[in-house]
């Protein structure tokens, strides 16, 4: 009997594996990845229209790099973009004393080109070099900032959390602060550039790479939010920070962590804003396999990028097995009390289902605010109508300013 039971179990396991493989193959057949020529055409279009992930890139620089790329080899891709960026980096270095404004502009240009050279994740030696160069170029650019950018290193589980802290100039006392968390393929450098816009309101920011991305010390797991709890511990030690007025902002995958923190750390958070937060359906096998392969909203390599950031995942089968445990429904978190939240999303999002935003809105103990673009895609973005920078400056920053009790012009609001 035991032998028969064993055979039955083996047969059931094989059936499950075959079904999963068949499902994945069918999904990949239905949603083919872009060819190299299609990637080039779409990337140039996005550069011309200020669309992610080519916001701020000169189309001429992109075309120059593409002229040297003949295959989808990751190192070839990185080398082509580094060759273009290196020229701006060298010019910037030579101009720092004689023409600092031009040098700074060149550093920005080099940083953005290097960053696209490592995009979406530094999954090869060449892309790792491009990422290292991007960090170097960004920090060279940040040297021109006033108030300055502080590179913070927080000891954490035998390693360190690297973050960027920037505080308003000449603040009369402790200031409110936003903990900004990157997404799957964005980085703390991008967040730091964007969140500079909040400084005039008298609000500081601390930008950090999410688990599995950038310089983060750990990968994604159901307990990886402990990394951000450690950041909050650190911020509590800074006399320049108002401990009672700390908010969180998370973008896409960073919005997942923002949502978890709104619940797990609600006692230490004044408010949390999230853009396109993955909550539950996103983590289910059927949705994952249908949305990640050949997703036209994502430029390329969506599934490989995800597989690279999750702890214990080395294959598609691993990801299918591990993804469901990240669901906030499975973790029994959604019904719990949370900090006040703003949920930003697009009804036409093909990367994170809009139903996850609605699920988050309809759970918890306090009313949540939402900005849903019925014509918007991921993060609520809509080409030429609601591009990323406009959503950030017209929707997210005003909400954070209001929730942190600050009036326009950086004056304290009377609450």
Give the predicted meaning of each segment.
Residues 337, 343-345:
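Short beta-strand/loop motif that positions the catalytic acidic residue
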């Amino acid at each position: 009997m035991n032998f028969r039971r064993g055979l039955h179990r083996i047969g059931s396991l094989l059936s499950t594996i075959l079904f999963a493989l068949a499902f994945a193959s069918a999904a990949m057949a239905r949603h083919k990845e872009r060819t190299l020529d299609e990637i080039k055409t779409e990337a140039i279009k996005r550069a011309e229209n200020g669309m992610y992930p080519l916001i701020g890139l000169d189309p001429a620089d992109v075309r120059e790099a593409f002229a040297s790329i003949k295959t989808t080899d990751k190192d070839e891709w990185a080398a082509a973009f580094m060759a273009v960026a290196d020229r701006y980096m060298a010019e910037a270095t030579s101009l720092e004393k004689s023409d600092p404004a031009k040098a700074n502009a060149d550093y920005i240009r080099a940083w953005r080109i290097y960053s696209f050279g490592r995009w979406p994740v530094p999954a090869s030696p060449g892309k790792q070099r491009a990422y290292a160069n991007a960090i170097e170029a960004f920090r060279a650019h940040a040297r021109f900032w006033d108030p300055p950018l502080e590179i913070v290193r927080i000891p954490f589980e035998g390693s360190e959390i690297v973050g960027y802290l920037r505080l308003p100039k000449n603040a009369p006392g402790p200031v409110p602060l936003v903990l900004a968390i990157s997404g799957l393929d964005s980085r703390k450098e991008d967040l730091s550039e964007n969140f500079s816009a909040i400084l005039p309101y008298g609000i500081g920011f601390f930008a950090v790479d999410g688990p599995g991305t950038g310089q983060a010390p750990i990968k994604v797991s159901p307990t990886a939010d402990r990394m951000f709890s450690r950041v909050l511990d650190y911020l509590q030690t800074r006399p320049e920070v108002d401990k009672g007025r700390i908010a969180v902002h998370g973008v896409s995958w960073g919005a997942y962590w923002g949502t978890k923190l709104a619940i797990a750390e609600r006692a230490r958070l004044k408010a949390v804003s999230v853009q396109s937060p993955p909550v539950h359906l996103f983590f289910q096998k059927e949705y994952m396999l249908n949305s990640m392969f050949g997703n036209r909203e994502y430029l390329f390599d969506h599934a490989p990028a995800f597989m690279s950031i999750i702890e214990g995942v080395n294959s598609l089968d691993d990801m299918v097995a591990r993804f469901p445990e990240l669901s906030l429904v499975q973790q029994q978190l959604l019904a719990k009390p949370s900090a006040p939240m703003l949920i930003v999303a697009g009804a036409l999002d093909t990367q994170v289902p809009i139903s996850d935003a609605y699920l988050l809105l309809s759970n918890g103990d306090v009313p949540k605010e939402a900005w849903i673009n019925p014509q918007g895609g991921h993060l609520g973005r809509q080409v030429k109508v609601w591009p990323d920078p406009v959503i950030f400056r017209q929707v997210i920053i005003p909400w954070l300013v209001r929730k942190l009790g600050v009036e326009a012009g950086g004056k304290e609001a009377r609450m």
